[in-house]
Each structure stands twice: as structure tokens, then as C-alpha cells.
Amino acid sequence: MEKSKNIWSLILTEIKKELSEEEFYVWFENLCFLESIGDNIQISTPNLFHKNQIEKRFTKKIKEILTKNGYNNVTIVFTNQPPKTYSSKQESEKTTFKETLQNFDKLKGNTLSKEPIQSIKDRIKMYIKEEEPTNFKNPFLKKRYTFENFIIGPNNRLAYNASLSISKNPGKKYNPCLIYGGVGLGKTHLLQSIGNKTEELHNNLKILYVTAENFLNEFVESIKTHETKKFKKKYRYLDMLLIDDIHDLQKKEGIQEELFHTFNALYEDNKQLVFTCDRSPSELTNFTDRLKSRFTRGLNVDISKPNFELRVAIIEKKAEEDGIKVPKDILNLVAQKVTTNVRDLEAAVTKLKAYIDLDNIEIDIDIVEKIIKEIIIYEKETTNESSNKINIENIKKILLRELKIAHKDIEGHSKKPEITKARHIYAYLLRNFTELSTVEIGKIIGGKTHSTVLYSINKIDRDRNNDKEINNLITELMNKIKKN
């Protein structure tokens, strides 16, 4: 029996030399030495799929190892029969993966075998000697982003509380966490604050903040320079990974595949993952389903546009930081007119400061109106999906005219094919030309549910790829909406 165990230990050792750490861990960690009957050594696998994959991938290699070491008559038999069904004698002879590694250490006279094994990964690292990254730096964390200077309101309170909790106890709960919402609402501020606060409270942890674009560029560069192993090592040895604007990875299957494996490696090791996105995971298109499912494993929390009271607080805070005094009526006017996001509110205060500092004039209503107009015009010019840019009524008007559909039908419950098709297109156009959520779009299209709207959007997206006529129709409609 002891000889058979040593043979199995030998096989594991030889295979370890040829596999990556991740592959070895995936395929062999859950195997269990059961017994030997004559020249047959029985190894238990966790399920039938695992058994079939092990046999398919490693039978040839195992035979080579046995032959090379003079065990020509020995056969390794894999079974998916649960260990508990074996007799008490066989149960006592069963050897787990950890025990097999310990046995091999003893066989070699390795003194490390006397120490307790903390984890399978730790043991694997003893055989696959890879150095962890040294001199770890986090160049993209900006110290100006803190929880202390984040303005809290009903639109972002849950996201704030979750972010603070993550900083205090990374990897314990809310893992992964995805914060989503429109442009300029504070997602980056919270993500950076998580990194800064965690660094302050847990200075021994390796924390990395990166934008999705930088993550992509770094991956592409690693392929060009044949340093993908270095790239993987950098990201899979982290204690906390913070990726901003994950939606920028849409339609990029290669980097999505890499992110999927990085996600798994960190998640299985209880390392914290936090992402930001401009929409909820269910609304992401051109993203692999398995990656979207990873995002929904933990907490998904949204940040909506600030209400009037919060807008006032944001302006007051920015004015205080910039050292200017804003009269109450001016402050309220800016808060009433600039309703888009935090970024635009702060831009308004910055412009006010410029007038005061450079022109040395007193701020009045006319100047404020001019500043607000500049901000709104800029928002229209730079935000392709802004709800200010294209009026919802114009979208509907063009759609009804071009498809020859009655107003009552598009928002009604008719199931005629041409009406249903028009509703699908309406939902798709609203999603592409406005910042409305699927719930808000559903209310516009006759009280449809989130899932119904999402189905419509995805259907048109698929049809455009597969049906030239549909694609031409949508393109024509979109061009007319833009020109209108």
C-alpha cells in the first residue's frame, strides 16, 4: 500500500513540473488516493466530468511517467465513486491530495513536511518556484479622493456605505462589488477612496487601481512583448483589484477572457474585487455571459443623479474648497439649472471662480445664466448619449412616421408583429440616444418590465448583426434622429 502511495506521489510531482500553478490546482487538488488492488491504483475524482477530463488530458502522460520509472505493469484507475461508499478499511487507506504531498516530502526527507500545510496553493508554490512581484507600486491612486470629501445623499448613500465597509474588511463581504451609474456621478471618487482608505488601514496589502482602458492596453502590450506571464503574475498576486469603467471592455473578447481568469484567481483566494460601470451588468451588451454572471455574484449598487438638496451641498463644498463666497440665490439658481451630474456642478463653480479672480467682478444673475448656458451646450456637444441632446418626443415622432405606426399602438399592448417590432426598435433607440434606464424606458413604452425592455434591446442588437434589412432600417432611423 505504501509503495502505491509513493507511486501516486511521484506521478503528481512529475506532472507539477509541466503544468501552470492554476492548471495543477484545478485538476489535482480534489483527487484522492483510495486503494490499490494488485497493480491497479484507484484514485477518486469529485464527479464524472472531472473523471472524464482527467482521463482525456493526463492518461498518456501518466503512462509515460510510469514507464520511465519502471512501473510498466501499474495502472492508474480513476473513479467518480464518492469515497464515503467505501468500506471502513478502505476509508482508512484513503489519502487526500494534501497528505500525498506530505508523503512525498517525507520520502525525499524534506524537513518542511514537519510544518503544517496552510493551503494547497502554498504547497504548490514550494514546487513551482515563482517569485511574487516586488517593489509594488500603485501609481494611479490619487490621494485627493477620500471618503471624507465625498458628499453623501440619498442617490449615493448605499454605494458610499458599501465602499467604506469594503475598505475596512476587504474580501470579507460585498465581494465582488460593482458600482454603476451615469457619467460624473462619483463612481471614480468612491473607487479611488476604497483604495486610499484600504491602503491606510491595511498597509501590508497589495492594492491596484486601474482603468479598464489601461488594463486593456497593458494586456495588449504584454502580448506584443511576449510578457503575458508577467502581466498575469502582476494581477493575480493582488489583495485588491479596482477596475474603473468596465464597460470599455465591451466587444473585446480577448481581454474579457483574461479578466475572467484573473477574476477567478482572486475571488477563489478571497481577494477583493471592485468595478465601476456606466450601467448595470444585465444591461451590458457584447459581454460574455460568464463574466457578467461573475459581476452579479456580490453587490451591485447604483448611483443616480443628485437631487436638488445634494446639488446645493456639492456647490457649497466646491465653493468652500475654492475659497469663494456664493450668494444663496446664485447657489440655488445653479442647483436648479445644472441637473446633470457632480462634474458639471463643480465646473460651474470653477467658472464662477475664474470670473471673480480674473475679471475681479461681482457675480450676478446674468453671469450665472451665461455660465450655465456654456455648461449645458458643452454637455450637449460632448455627450453622445445625453438625454439633453435628443428629445424623447422627437425619437418617437420619427419612429412613428417612418414605420407608419399609430401613437396609441406604440405604447399599447397590441401583439401584431409590426407593432411588436416597432416597440423593440423604440426601446433600442431610447437606450442609444438617452441615459434612461431600462425601467424608465419600460414606463415610456406602455409600462413594460426591465426584462422585457432588455430583451428588446438585445434582440435588435442581434438582428442588426444578422439581418441587413434591419440594420439598414436602424441606421436610417438613427441618422434622421441625429439630423432632427
UniProtKB/Swiss-Prot annotation:
The record's Gene3D superfamilies line, in alphabetical order, gives: 1.10.1750.10, 1.10.8.60, 3.30.300.180, P-loop containing nucleotide triphosphate hydrolases (3.40.50.300)
Q: Where is this region: Domain I, interacts with DnaA modulators?
A: 1-74
Q: Where is this region: Domain II?
A: 74-139
Record GO cellular component, one term = plasma membrane
Tell me a GO biological process for this protein.
Answer: DNA replication initiation
According to the UniProt entry, its GO molecular function terms are: ATP binding; ATP hydrolysis activity; DNA replication origin binding; lipid binding
Residue segments, region Domain IV, binds dsDNA: 357-484
Primary role = Plays an essential role in the initiation and regulation of chromosomal replication. ATP-DnaA binds to the origin of replication (oriC) to initiate formation of the DNA replication initiation complex once per cell cycle. Binds the DnaA box (a 9 base pair repeat at the origin) and separates the double-stranded (ds)DNA. Forms a right-handed helical filament on oriC DNA; dsDNA binds to the exterior of the filament while single-stranded (ss)DNA is stabiized in the filament's interior.
Q: What is this protein called?
A: Chromosomal replication initiator protein DnaA
Q: Which organism is it from?
A: Borrelia garinii subsp. bavariensis (strain ATCC BAA-2496 / DSM 23469 / PBi) (Borreliella bavariensis)
* Name of the gene: dnaA
